[in-house]
Amino acid sequence: MPLSHIRVLDLTLARAGPTAVRQFADWGADVIRVEPPAAGGVVIDDRHGPDFQNLHRNKRAITLDLKSDAGHALFLDLVRDADVLIENMRSDVKHRLGIDYETLREINPRLVYGSLSGFGQDGPYGTRPGMDQEIGRAHV
């Protein structure tokens, strides 16, 4: 496969991010989906449903609590060996977690960092979550 030598860390949720990263997986990249622990022991996504299976096919997964010291340290170990990282977090969240581009490039200068956002990384709406339904109504 053309991308079999590439390791991608997937920190995306919803649809746009997982769809984009799925393309890497479909072309043979080693994609590791980094998932947060289930809130209150409840898994949000139906892992056996067709939508989840379609979005996350050909990906491996690990559950890490990036808010904990141990989870954050394990994540940084993954970053050291990664080629690409893709996330779709609000800018304030990734900075608070210490997983923004500026921080991670200190650990891995060759890391290609992709960030999806509905309203940009800064500006008046930079910290707002952005999903297709919200952006579609933005003109109203």
Predicted feature residues:
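N-terminal helix-loop segment corresponding to the beta1-alpha1 unit
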Residues: 1-139
